[in-house]
Structure formats: C-alpha cells, structure tokens
Amino acid sequence: MNIDFSKIEETCTPNFKGGEKYYAARRYEDGLNRITMGRLVPGASIGLHTHEDSSEIMFFTGGSGYVVCDGERLPVSAGSVHYCPKGHSHTLVNDSPDTDLTFNAVVPVQ
C-alpha cells in the first residue's frame, strides 16, 4: 500500500499538546497506526507529552530543531531519526529562525 500525502488535506492544530504556534500535518490512520507527514514553522513546538499506549518514530526530512526525550535534549535535522518508546515522554521544537522543520512520523498502537 502506498500513501499519497499530496492527496490528504493538511490540518493545522494550534498549540498542539500545549506547544507553541501550530502543528501542520497530513495524517493517515487505520486504527492500528497513525502515519503523518508533519511540519513545524519556525518557533513552533509540539508540547511535552507521554506515549501511554503507543510509541513514536520520527524521520526528519528538512530543517533543524531539537527533541527533549525523558529530559535529554537531542538535536534533529534532515536524516535524523527519533524514537520515543511506549511509556516515555518527549517534545519537539523548531528553533530555526526561518526554516520549517519537516518530518514523517509513525505511531503504532500497542
């Protein structure tokens, strides 16, 4: 199965999980997995949250920023992969002054 994100409407969620600005995403969900093409504008963030019943894998495709996972700050940029296991907490921040932070994410229900 192929997912064509260009055919999925982008939605913008302000202050996602308590973050700054808004989170823009194109999402595919089938009840078992959520697969997302996401984008954070400069200065935007996804707030700190815990994956109670899922994990998350994020594949960064453009821009730069950082994640804080279980209190550890880690840089991310195109080519980086971030994994947040079930039961752990993380946040994502685009600290670039002028470039969107783009990524694909997979959240399997566990």
Show where each model-derived region lies:
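Ligand-binding loop in jelly-roll beta-barrel domains
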Residues: K86-Q110
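A short, N-terminal "cap"/entry segment at the start of jelly-roll beta-barrel domains
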Residues: M1-N33, G47
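A generic "binding-loop/recognition-motif" signal
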Residues: P42, D53, E72, H88-S89, ...
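Short acidic-glycine-tyrosine-enriched beta hairpin
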Residues: E72-K86
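Conserved short histidine dyad/triad with adjacent acidic residue
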Residues: T36-H51
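Glycine- and acidic-residue-biased ligand/ion/polar-headgroup-sensing regions
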Residues: D53-S55, F59-G65
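Histidine-centered metal-chelating micro-motifs
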Residues: S45-G47, Y66, H82, K86-L92
